[in-house]
Amino acid sequence: MGAGGQLNAMGLSSNQQKGERNNSFERINESHADDTVFIVGGYTRCELLAHTPKDESKIGDDDDEENASFSVEERKASKKEENDEMKSKAGVHVLSLDGRTGQLEMVTTNDIGPNVAFVTRHPTKPDVIYASTERIDVEGEVVTMRLTRDLRLKEIARCSAGGKSTCYLNFNKSNRYMMSVNYWDAKLALIHLDDLGRPETPNTVFMQPGAKYVDDKKPTREEHWEFRQRWPHSHCIVTEPYHNMLHFVVDLGLDRIFVYRVGEPSTMVTAPEFVCKASVKLQPGKGPRHLVFHQTLKTAYLVNELDSTVSVFNVNVNDEWMEQLPLANEQPTMKTFDDEKDTKEESDETAALNVFQCISTLPEGSREQKVFTDRGVWKAASHASEIRVHPSGKFLYVGNRGHDSIACFKIDAEDGSLEFIAAVPSGGKCPRNFHFSANGGFVCVGNQNSSNVASFAVCPESGMLELVHVRHSVCLPNYVYPIPKSTLDLVTSSDDDEDVVL
């Protein structure tokens, strides 16, 4: 056919196809300050996970009348076929949100996986996107992708994340190292980034106290379902915003928060290391999950997954912790936390985090609901998931899986304490993750078990949420990452680029 290329099934040449994608990109480029692109990670192989998400998006209470004439068996078979088709395309979805209306549009679907569980962007390289893979059979991976101008994601590299069920990625202050957190075996890894932003083999893997349980006992996920706190489960590594030097690791299994510094090596033949500066013990059984810091107040908020509460802390940053660390001088290695040597627990007055409030994420009447598994093991009817502070600093939100709602709180401008506003239905089942649009006018919620993403308008005065739109066929969403559309001008990679050049 010459320069026009071969026709596809719709009769479009390759050049015409590129033109269609460019037109779509131009439509997205009709700017509004709150226009946002959301990268949504999704589960694709549930048998590899520590938990068991259920895709209820095609059958159940929401079935329409058209399907009512079919038997349950026929509907299940149809559901499986549709879900298999969805999963074959799934991995990472790219959605665009209209900053005027809150409407969501599916832009691209990228076959990257399995089980993309966390998504983030390089701090200084706008083309570079990272994702972690969540699995317990082998070590998870950090997947490096290139974002193109037509909003596709091209995988360019993979490396080990240093442990299993990789659930969180972050960067140290110099941006020379990525920090990964692995839930299943409570291992933290430091991974050097090359000049193009590509992560290399982990330089240092650090085992949290008690983490050898996984290596020694080889627990099954059935054991995990019954005993969520039998061994450590590190869930996130969050950097304080005051100096960008202290990294807070929350461990669900230990009911503890550890405070680390990263010691960088003097040469690339030596290894970096985590240096523990403090740890904070929490009330047993809370099951802490994620920590966030207020933008202007020295206040931190911790969501406790197992009892559906938020703990509110005053933050105390010790000046001595900011002093220069001695340079690491050992070869890349596996390190184990020395509980007696490395744990530093202070009094309430000098603790890194001093709790002064604990508040439920559930409305009255839903706080004491319990269910029992088939084996008679107690389990709460709802478990808290993500926690985020609104960009305005005026409100805080938490996901409730089971209650299927987003809890809304007002933040006191003086002391950072919380006032419960309401729990708003999440627009689906099992709201696992959510994030705000560029200016905070909307919040997008990934509902895992209904395979949809719902957008809500945020009232700037009250903080209440109003459902605007639900985008279906987003397979088992588990992480929602926003990119302000205004920053897409910095993305220079085009769809025509065949070589991997960042």
Where is each model-derived feature located?
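Surface-exposed loop and turn segments in beta-propeller and other repeat-based domains
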Residues: 204-229, 278-279, 328-378, 472-487
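Short loop/turn segments immediately following the C-termini of beta-strands
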Residues: 43-45, 134-136, 183, 193, ...
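Short loop/turn segments immediately following beta-strands, especially the blade-tip
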Residues: 95-102, 145-151, 190-201, 261-271, ...
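Loop/turn-rich, solvent-exposed surfaces of beta-rich toroidal or solenoidal domains
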Residues: 381-415, 423-445
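Asp-box/WD-like beta-propeller blade repeats and closely related beta-sheet repeat scaffolds
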Residues: 152-236
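Surface loop/turn motifs at the tips and blade-to-blade linkers of beta-strand repeat domains
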Residues: 109-113, 158-162, 227-229, 279-284, ...
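Short coil/turn segments that connect the beta-strands within blades of beta-propeller domains
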Residues: 35-36, 126-127, 174-176, 242-245, ...
